[in-house]
Amino acid sequence: HNYGGKEGLNLQQIYEAGEPFEKFIDHPSWINHMLEFVGGKDTFDHQHGPLFIDENFANVRGPGEAIGIHSGNPEGIQRNHYRYQDGKFHCSQVNILIALKKIGPGDGGTVVIPSSHKSNIQHPEYKHNKMKKNRLSSAEKMTGSLEVFLDAGDALLFVDSLCHGSAKRINKGERRIVVYRYGPSWGFFRHPYRPSTRLLNKLTKFQRKIVMPHEKILTPDR
């Protein structure tokens, strides 16, 4: 799907696409960071499992495409908030973005506004550069923004309350990335897609707890 503009094509729940994408669920390069930043160990947040992936996708974006700025702490969205208390992180959504191809100048790299996850004031240029349906918007010209360049195989980790978007791709070819979003076990799926039985049967016990921590639904009188 897409968001109705020029953000490229998303292939949702990409962990269904085979073993390479299954390995990303608990990849050793970042799984311990996710456990640390989502937090919640020995609390209700771990009642169903250590983490939950509510959405994961591959994104393909061509020339002239971009995604406008979005998120940011001033929006106050509980789904993706940032919190640090008593020496521990409690973040509702933490993203890992993996570059499948090199992303350099002109390739439409991810753009972030550093420290915006801690801000209580909206960026003064936010409304001009935010995502807009049926209209191209990008974030590379925002004051204080930082475009992130990646080599193929690099992974970028950030809390979703960080204000972020992308630059417009001006080079030929396609920008190809994969994104996995992690949060506490009580979360639920963003879109109406559920993991297949085939996938769940292939995963390790730890992976299944991350992909589908929810218990079997108990229906009254059945």
Identify what each model region corresponds to.
Residues 1-81:
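Non-heme Fe(II)-dependent double-stranded beta-helix
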Residues 90-93, 103-163:
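Double-stranded beta-helix
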